[in-house]
């Protein structure tokens, strides 16, 4: 039910403030952060990523993609890497343990308000390298798929 604004101007379980445009009504679609993503290379699927976690879905999905494509991490390392998330209100940058002290210092020097938080989204991903597929299930969630 947190995809709808049950009470206008009151935060939901994720801290998002709802308004009348997203009020609960019959035949209305809820606001959603779902972002199942397929990355193509030369028209073929290269990476598939999805996540759970309300407004943290987009951050978890994007950071997993960047970790694989830009930072050349394995799919399992990309899924397990610590994450950051900002959602406008409240005006603070949440981060997971494991973010380097240098990164934290740099963010503080740029006047970000920081707060350590656990499990900023839960991602699942499959990467293709040639004919080889590699899958990763986020250990932030206890009931996960096996990736052996």
Where in the sequence are the language-model features?
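Short, glycine-/Ser/Thr-/acidic-enriched flexible segments
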Residues: 1-4, 29-31, 36-45, 52-56, ...
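Active-site rim segments in enzyme catalytic domains, especially the processed small/beta chain
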Residues: 1-43, 47, 71, 75
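A short, polar/proline- and glycine-enriched secondary-structure boundary/capping micro-motif
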Residues: 7-9, 56-62, 144-148
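Extended C-terminal subregions enriched in glycine
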Residues: 10, 25-30, 61, 70-118
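Second-shell loop/turn segments in exported
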Residues: 48-52, 91-94
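Alpha-helical support elements that line or immediately flank enzyme active sites
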Residues: 51-73
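Cofactor-centric catalytic regions
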Residues: 98-148
